[in-house]
Amino acid sequence: MDKLIITGGVRLDGEIRISGAKNSALPILAATLLCDGPVTVANLPHLHDITTMIELFGRMGIEPVIDEKLSVEIDPRTIKTLVAPYELVKTMRASILVLGPMVARFGEAEVALPGGCAIGSRPVDLHIRGLEAMGAVIDVEGGYIKAKAPEGGLRGANFFFDTVSVTGTENIMMAAALARGRSVLQNAAREPEVVDLANFLIAMGAKISGAGTDTITIDGVERLHSAIYKVMPDRIETGTYLVAAAVTGGRVKVKDTDPTILEAVLEKLKEAGAEVTTGSDWIELNMHGKRPKAVNVRTAPYPAFPTDMQAQFISLNAIAEGTGAVIETIFENRFMHVYELHRMGAKIQVEGNTAIVTGTEILKGAPVMATDLRASASLVISALMAEGDTLIDRIYHIDRGYECIEEKLQMLGAKIRRVPG
């Protein structure tokens, strides 16, 4: 199992390119199953989850053609099985996204429950109830969701999401694209990745309006045609590198990104004392060698502050001037990284869904362990400005969401290297 060794204390400086968004690429890949011809998806990030989705397609009889320019061509007409097996689904919760497209296009699907996810848990329940509202008959047995469309296919429906669910919105929107009649999704997720998926579906001929608001209207069509589409930039990767620049007092320009989808994060970075300038597809952050000021953060669904940037801002507050509160309203148990940061000397107190962080001038390098994707990013950020060496174990979490992280940080001057476990 690979590890990262980071020698801290280097001020980051330079330019990097931002990769395509994993959280957009995965549903877009799933949506290719709706098409009755070949589809090309460009700007895919080279990440483990993307590889797993492509492997899932291969297991189903589809043979994606990948080129060196980060694009893939998928022709779903060669599909031979409508089963998404557990050995693949367990490694990637987003594989539930093939459920809606398969039922809508092929009339049935058998998808393993995502690993560690009981049926009573709200996110999976929303996917199932949304499809049932469209007429699907669904059984959950043996750890699999078995879904069958009614005779004549799925029917348009009005569906209200009890809680805002990004993947739930995406799954039902994809299914509705080929359903008979109109579907209206209320309390829908507003995330940019949902908008990107809607734009991809529209490029294939879907009739969708309202994406980016809490009410999405879909008028089902008989078929979706071939298209070529470029995945949006990754806003969380963008934010992560900007925070890394801020904690090291550095200057970093991120290119091939979109400032308009990261406004809540950029405002907090300005509040922390960063000079932030933007163009149509770039953001530059300059700390001028200063130590950041502590900021208060409260996570909430888009367009508010994203939960996927919470851990990074705990790392920022850990070395900032003053004390900042970070309130997590989206997920439980999302402060696992705090206990690893304690090993580096961070002063953090967790009270329920709130982390109170008192900044300290210097963190000390230490052996730490990544517990999940975004927590691992917070450890990298803290290691970049810590005194001495930090060894980060279980970095497969990082590889799920950050393309070539050590190479990109090396381009900015960081002393970071990957070593085999």
UniProtKB/Swiss-Prot annotation:
Leading EC class: transferase
GO cellular component: cytoplasm
Catalytic activity: phosphoenolpyruvate + UDP-N-acetyl-alpha-D-glucosamine = UDP-N-acetyl-3-O-(1-carboxyvinyl)-alpha-D-glucosamine + phosphate
Gene3D superfamilies: Enolpyruvate transferase domain
Entry annotation: catalytic residues: 117
Compartments, record wording: Cytoplasm
Alphabetized InterPro entries for the sequence: Enolpyruvate_Tfrase_dom, Enolpyruvate_Tfrase_sf, MurA_subfamily, RNA3'P_cycl/enolpyr_Trfase_a/b, UDP_GlcNAc_COvinyl_MurA
An example molecular function term from Gene Ontology annotations: UDP-N-acetylglucosamine 1-carboxyvinyltransferase activity
Chain positions recorded as phosphoenolpyruvate binding sites: 22-23
Residues annotated for UDP-N-acetyl-alpha-D-glucosamine binding in this entry: 93, 122-126, 308, 330
Pathway as given in its UniProt record: Cell wall biogenesis; peptidoglycan biosynthesis
EC number(s) on file: 2.5.1.7
UniProt modified residues of type 2-(S-cysteinyl)pyruvic acid O-phosphothioketal: 117
Keywords: Cell cycle, Cell division, Cell shape, Cell wall biogenesis/degradation, Cytoplasm, Peptidoglycan synthesis, Pyruvate, Transferase
SUPFAM superfamilies per record: EPT/RTPC-like
UniProt GO BP: cell division; cell wall organization; peptidoglycan biosynthetic process; regulation of cell shape; UDP-N-acetylgalactosamine biosynthetic process
Family: Belongs to the EPSP synthase family. MurA subfamily.
Role noted for this protein: Cell wall formation. Adds enolpyruvyl to UDP-N-acetylglucosamine.
Matches recorded under PANTHER family: UDP-N-ACETYLGLUCOSAMINE 1-CARBOXYVINYLTRANSFERASE
Protein name: UDP-N-acetylglucosamine 1-carboxyvinyltransferase
Designated gene of the protein: murA
